[in-house]
Amino acid sequence: MPPQLVVFDLDETITRHDTLLPYAMGFVIRRKPWRLPLFATVAPPTVEYLLGRSDEGRVKESFIKAALAGTRRSDIDAWTSRFVPPLIARGTFANAMERIAEHRRAGDHLVLMSASTDLYVPTIARELGFNETICTGVRWDGDRLNGSLTTPNRKGEEKARCFTALREQHPGLDTTAYGNSSTDLPHLRLATHGFLVNGSEKARRAARELGVACVDWT
């Protein structure tokens, strides 16, 4: 079988839970608990988002700034090195790991595409043997983390845009894509073979209408 272009979402598709919250909060609690009161600054952009006046990217940006702004690159790298191994060992779906291994054996081009950030997603991708990573970028000021986003939040229609660009970069390849939520459907529907993993009932109904297969992973 010829190689395929295979795109995996990360949070709740490969991993059992969200990754950004435990990554950032784990760092703060262990390394800089004095920053906890700064999370109050996340409330205003969250309210704006809930009222439809802002996008989720601004909430993410404010959260990252509250938790990590000003942190040295060496400290971020050290925390990432500590955070990723147990996440892969104990925080992933066995079925996801098996499917990744199958695609690697088949010689497929594996892309990890996530709304989570480039502080740690590329490390996860390397550890799992992915060929390429697309994720939300975060700005640095020299050796210190700024926390502003340098890319659009890689979610929803933005993922569909990135998926379309990937297909253009790899012409002639069949495509397989895995995601877990209704916000993944815009790019799953574009794939030759799209799979909704452990989706909600509402997401499953929408997936079936779009011809996206539904699977359950443990």
Regions picked out by a protein language model, each given a short descriptive name:
Residues 1-51:
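Active-site neighborhood of HAD-like aspartate-dependent phosphohydrolases
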